[in-house]
């Protein structure tokens, strides 16, 4: 996964082509979340103008499709497929969800996976968020609870980072259609 920042916004195509030639799966993301130690992610993030220029290409590389979403839309596939384990054994629902719910040094990984908290998070829908199910940007947005938590300490709030990506997608989508 390549995070796209102000510094490297012109070289992700080279990395993508290298991965394609070498049959390596590749993902690219311009949603830069605040650092786990200090809230400085916005210093590296692309402006809306910069993001609009490349968002369609990022979406094509990642296979993103614009779809209508009901209030029961499950917002995050990774929460149903994987866990993130920190260097000290902390288990987090994903790499963006900066909150440990267990520790592999003390708990069995299968028990952690089957835990109610993980299941609840993996079934997070638009209606579980504060405003996502009624937002006009909903079909363009990732609605990432991990980014919302990193940005504002509330996984159900509207993430400004996700909102900026959604605006860039909408501007590109409306320009084409």
Regions found by a protein language model. Give the residues of each.
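Flexible mid-to-C-terminal extensions adjoining Fe-S/redox cofactors in radical SAM and related proteins
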Residues: 96-177
